[in-house]
Amino acid sequence: MKNVLYIIDDHNMVRNGLKSYLESHTEWKVIKNFDNSRDCLSFLEKLPAEDEIFPEILIVDVQLMGENGFQLVREISKNFPQIKCVMYSMYDTAGFILQAKDSGAKAYISKIAKEEELVHCLELVQREQTYLEDHMIQTQNKISSIVTMLSKQEKNIFEAILQGKSNQQICDELFLSNRTVENYTSRLYSKISVKDREELIKKYSK
């Protein structure tokens, strides 16, 4: 069986709506739906790669019942490199686009994109290509030169700020003290020529 994909999204209506559209208008077969990453990983670990229902593509929401969809994509990329991941989200700011790329996703598409765009995205990814919507490409190009001059932790903090995360959330996620985050943030501001968080978001979020 070809054209097999799974959908991982914690909203039942989204999963069912995507499945209905894709199976009615394309040759894709949505064999499995999951509302969390644990069940998806557990299922894949028990499924032989040669099985006819082994997926070519996963459509993954960024946020899954409090979980991080990016972490799922990282684990898929590491443990199942033959599976291609498409991030599907309401968020289309620079921080999310950067993190999707870093996690190993082949595409990032907004949930408000037209159905035809999603189909086009899947076609490209199936052919080993990548996909971003036009306005996302502009965003990525805008920040690509910035990212290259940042350290790993500065980049992590840059992405987190663009996602609207507080300093405490950044501390918790990166396992850093508040003072350490403040130091990295200060160096980040200096490198990208902004004076504070508000200016960074205004300058680089779109």
Regions found by a protein language model. Give the residues of each.
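The feature encodes the CheY-like receiver
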Residues: 14, 65
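Acidic catalytic/metal-coordinating carboxylates
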Residues: 36, 68-71
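Active-site beta3 strand of CheY-like receiver
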Residues: 48-59, 64
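Active-site residues of response regulator receiver
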Residues: 61-62, 89, 111
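Short amphipathic alpha-helix used as the core "switch/output" element in two-component signaling
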Residues: 70-82
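Short, flexible helix-to-coil linker/hinge segments that flank and couple to helix-turn-helix
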Residues: 97-101, 107-152
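Helix-turn-helix DNA-binding segment
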Residues: 141-180
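Basic, Lys/Arg-enriched C-terminal extension of HTH/homeodomain DNA-binding domains
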Residues: 186-206
